Amino acid sequence: QMEDEINVANFAVGAGYAGARSACATSGGGFALMTEVVGFASMIEAPVVMIEVARGGPSTGLPTKTEQGDLNQLYGASQGDFPRAIIAQSSIEEGFYLGQEALNIAEEYQMPVLLSSDLYLGEHFETVPLYDFDKVPIERGKFYPDKVPDGFLRYELTKDGISPRTIPGAKGGRHDA
C-alpha cells in the first residue's frame, strides 16, 4: 500500500512500463489526484488500467448515494489532448471481463484505460456464474519482453500509429522515453 493515490498511480504506470499487466483503483476524490499521472502514462505510451469507482455528489461524495457523476472527470483527466479509453461496467460479472479487456486495450494501444464503476457495484455482494478465464484471451500487442528485433525503435512511426515496445534491460531495447 502506498502513501497516497499519486504514488499508487505512478507505481502502476511504472509496472506497465516494466512489462507487467498493471492496474490500480480509487474513488472520485482519489482519481482527481491521479490525473497528472494519466497524462504521463499517455506521454510515455505506458499501458495501465485505472479503475475509478464513482460516489454520489461533489468532493468526497455522499457515502450512501450512487451515481455515475465522475464521467466528465474521466474525459478531462490531465491536461492536453491525448488518447485514452474509457469503459463503464454495468454489472459485477461484466466488470470482471471488462477488466481483462481493459488490460488488453491498454497493452495493444499503449495508453491508459479508465474503467468506470459506481458505489453500488463497488460495494455490494452478488453470486455470479463461475468465471470463464479463457473468455478474454490475453493480448499483449507489439511487445518484445525478451528478444528485441534488430533496428528496434521504441517510438517508430508506423502505419497503424502503434510502435513496438519492450521492457527495461531487454537486449537491444535501449531507448529514451
Describe each model-derived feature in a short phrase.
Residues 1-76, 85-106:
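Thiamine diphosphate
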Residues 57-60, 69-79, 137, 141, ...:
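Ligand-binding clefts of soluble mixed alpha/beta catalytic domains
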Residues 82:
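Short acidic, glycine-rich surface-loop motifs adjacent to enzyme active sites
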Residues 98-177:
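Flexible, low-complexity linker and terminal segments
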